[in-house]
């Protein structure tokens, strides 16, 4: 081969590998190279008819390239100045910078941090980021796939042809990167990978994409990153003060929402609202109802709507079902303007096995465990993250931090924590692998959760975010500080309280006396953790019926039972959570294909329940006795906890500074007249709430809004009062 041969410097094996799209290092062959005969440009452009090289500065011709093999062009040029390629696509001429004329974009330092498990390096290095390189606009693509033989980025810009844009491997981190000039936001793309043995894999969506196609499409989309990361936030005051609004001593009442079905548009094929519409409709509603926070079931992109978001693949991308990422940022900003916090359900426990997702990402079990006893969740037919791997742990923590940092979210409710903590969770004896000490505890998950909670406390510029665990076992120290050996969550769902009290309420009042302990047992462990009392979507799905449907009795009794239960819940220690539809006594259980039955509000009973929840939220926020000592023993005292025969409960709530309330619940349909209760202090007490009030749909029985104690001792108190206890009702009294 002569020195003037356009193939000079190319070995036959390299030529074969390039045209067959299996070369592991395309930058070693393509682009500008200096040879003894002068500068040479090589370009891989399948389906091109002719290629020439022109000066980037003035368009002057620098040389013509010869086609060595179909799609592979090479030739000498007169100058090694910055250049562009003039490509004749059989009659359509394109002028563009050569992807392979640009050097590496990612620095060694952040790549080193990525390999070491730094979540901020994930945010810095991976995904698709519009930028300028050497004055040329384009997009830097980067993906972690250490075991792939070759990775190409494919998309609208190259006709989804993996031969066009093979990427550069940065060996120290197993990251493939490529700067593609003249590509911009809005472009669809995926990655084409060859496994270690050269086997082509299904096209993969970008695990770190900030934007995606709307399902059933599965492509990633180059996001307007600056419109998110430089969003003009107006919530500085909220962010700086929110730490004081989300503590154990704060009133927290959460409205749980499935965003897609909250209010469907029947006239437009039952479509869900987008973020702009949700901001316009949902925020004023939630605020008017007195809730302090809205919690969304997972909004990270997920292929299957029937998973309700709990099988996500786009851990960094708000679902395209609701609009663009910057629209979600605008929703959060408007929520904060209205004084509402935003909590997201977040799923680090498992991921679905869709071929375009994380499973066998680079031809190996990269994100999941290789052993199905560790890497497969048989209950959900999903894959379990390998949290013992630095990069996987960093990937997930980066996702959590991204929602907090990029979108100013106020908290993460971490899903399925119990399944993460135990290696034998829902497994037969021979279907799990012990930890290194022979135990059932998942040490890698424990370390992950501790690190997550530590990192959430130190997100630059956005202090005060919280984490909430959905943890259904008695694992100790879920909300204890990491420094004290705990997991470090701020709050934990009290699943035991929920199960026990719902079981009690489902009983016919005749039999409730035999289940009295179900209503009192929660106080035995109420201060072992910082709890949220959850009446979530989980209790109104899969044939369980609605909250109203669980209540026994005729129509009147069902509503009365639900109102009494809400009164008990809102005055019981623990933060509050209620799923959409529950606030007005939805009749049917949750159906993600339909909205809550808002038309029921035309019925006075349903409207009455809604008004009660509104008033309970207001009472809760206005009365420090109901929240200030939620997580401290001094805030609660049983006055009557043992009257199982009458199914009556009475307790005292106090803020420790002189303000106190007395709550009395009658859980039978029998009015109790002259029922004597020992009162913490003598004098007048105002009846500030009665769930049997006529405005709520009740019988309007009560104490006329005011009671006076007398000197007759009762229940260990020197003062007492003879009360009228309405049927199936909760009353709240405040010392006047």
Curated annotation (Swiss-Prot):
Its EC number is 2.4.1.18. InterPro entries: A-amylase/branching_C, Branching_enzy, GlgB, GlgB_N, GlgB_N_E_set_prok, Glyco_hydro_13_cat_dom, Glyco_hydro_13_N, Glyco_hydro_b. Transmembrane segments: none annotated. It catalyses: Transfers a segment of a (1->4)-alpha-D-glucan chain to a primary hydroxy group in a similar glucan chain. Belongs to the glycosyl hydrolase 13 family. GlgB subfamily. Catalyzes the formation of the alpha-1,6-glucosidic linkages in glycogen by scission of a 1,4-alpha-linked oligosaccharide from growing alpha-1,4-glucan chains and the subsequent attachment of the oligosaccharide to the alpha-1,6 position. Monomer. This is 1,4-alpha-glucan branching enzyme GlgB. It comes from Paraburkholderia xenovorans (strain LB400). The lineage of its organism: Bacteria, Pseudomonadati, Pseudomonadota, Betaproteobacteria, Burkholderiales.
């Amino acid at each position: 081969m002569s020195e003037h041969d356009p193939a000079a410097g190319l070995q036959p094996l390299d030529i074969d590998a390039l045209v067959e799209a299996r070369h592991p290092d395309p930058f070693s062959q393509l682009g500008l190279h200096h040879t003894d005969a002068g500068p040479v440009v090589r370009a891989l452009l399948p389906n091109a008819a002719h290629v020439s090289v022109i000066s980037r500065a003035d368009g002057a011709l620098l040389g013509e390239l010869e086609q060595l093999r179909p799609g592979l062009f090479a030739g000498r040029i007169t100058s090694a100045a910055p250049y562009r390629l003039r490509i004749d696509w059989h009659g359509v001429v394109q002028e563009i910078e050569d992807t392979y004329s640009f050097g590496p974009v990612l620095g060694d330092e952040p790549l080193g941090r990525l390999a070491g498990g730094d979540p901020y390096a994930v945010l810095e290095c991976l995904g698709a980021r519009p930028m300028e390189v050497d004055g040329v606009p384009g997009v830097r693509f980067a993906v972690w796939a250490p075991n792939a033989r070759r990775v190409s980025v494919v998309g609208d810009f190259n006709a989804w042809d993996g031969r066009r844009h093979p990427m550069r491997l940065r060996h120290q981190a197993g990251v493939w990167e490529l700067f593609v000039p003249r590509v911009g936001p809005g472009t669809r793309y995926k990655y084409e990978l060859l496994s270690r043995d050269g086997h082509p894999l299904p096209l993969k969506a970008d695990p770190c994409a900030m934007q995606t196609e709307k399902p059933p499409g599965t492509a990633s989309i180059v996001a307007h990153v600056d419109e998110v990361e430089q969003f003009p936030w107006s919530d500085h005051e909220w962010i700086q003060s929110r730490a004081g609004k989300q503590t154990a001593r704060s009133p927290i009442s959460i409205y749980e929402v499935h965003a897609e079905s909250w209010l469907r548009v029947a006239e437009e094929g039952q479509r869900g609202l987008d973020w702009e519409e949700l901001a316009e409709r949902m925020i004023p509603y939630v605020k008017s109802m007195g809730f302090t926070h809205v919690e969304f079931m997972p909004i990270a992109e997920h292929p299957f709507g029937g998973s309700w978001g709990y099988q996500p693949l786009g851990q960094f991308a708000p679902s395209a079902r609701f609009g663009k990422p910057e629209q979600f940022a605008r929703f959060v900003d408007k929520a904060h303007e209205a004084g509402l916090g935003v909590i997201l359900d977040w799923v680090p426990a498992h991921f679905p096995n869709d071929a375009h997702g994380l499973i066998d990402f680079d031809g190996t079990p990269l994100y999941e465990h290789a052993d199905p006893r560790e890497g497969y969740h048989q209950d959900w037919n999903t894959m379990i993250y390998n949290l013992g791997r630095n990069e996987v742990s960093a990937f997930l923590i980066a996702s959590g931090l991204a929602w907090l940092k990029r979108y100013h979210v106020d908290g993460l409710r971490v899903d399925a924590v119990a399944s993460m903590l135990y290696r034998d969770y829902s497994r037969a004896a021979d279907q799990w692998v012990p930890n290194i000490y022979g135990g059932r505890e998942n040490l890698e998950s424990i370390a992950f959760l501790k690190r997550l909670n530590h990192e959430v406390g130190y997100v630059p510029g956005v202090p005060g975010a919280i984490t909430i665990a959905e943890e259904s076992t008695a694992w100790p120290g879920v909300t204890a500080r990491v420094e004290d050996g705990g997991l470090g969550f701020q709050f934990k769902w009290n699943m035991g309280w929920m199960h026990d009290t719902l079981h009690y309420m489902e009983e016919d009042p005749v039999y409730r006396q035999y289940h009295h302990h179900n209503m009192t047992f929660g106080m035995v462990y109420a201060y072992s953790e910082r709890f949220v009392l959850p009446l979530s979507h989980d209790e109104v799905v899969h044939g369980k019926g609605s909250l109203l449907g669980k209540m026994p009795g005729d129509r009147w009794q069902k509503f009365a039972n639900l109102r009494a239960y809400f009164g008990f819940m809102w005055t019981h220690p623990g933060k509050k959570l209620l799923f959409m539809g529950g606030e007005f006594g939805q009749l049917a259980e949750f159906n993600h294909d339909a909205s809550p039955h808002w038309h029921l509000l035309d019925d006075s009973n349903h409207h009455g329940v809604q008004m009660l929840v509104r008033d309970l939220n207001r009472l809760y926020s206005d009365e420090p006795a109901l929240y200030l000592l939620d997580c401290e023993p001094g805030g609660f005292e049983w006055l009557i906890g043992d009257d199982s025969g009458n199914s009556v409960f009475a307790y005292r709530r106090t803020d420790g500074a002189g303000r106190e309330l007395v709550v009395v619940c009658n859980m039978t349909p029998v009015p109790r007249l002259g029922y004597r209760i020992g009162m913490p202090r003598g004098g007048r007490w105002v009846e500030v709430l009665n769930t049997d009030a006529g405005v709520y749909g009740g019988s309007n029985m009560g104490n006329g809004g005011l009671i006076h104690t007398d000197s007759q001792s009762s229940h260990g108190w020197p003062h007492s009062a003879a009360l009228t206890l309405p049927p199936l009702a909760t009353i709240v009294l405040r010392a006047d």
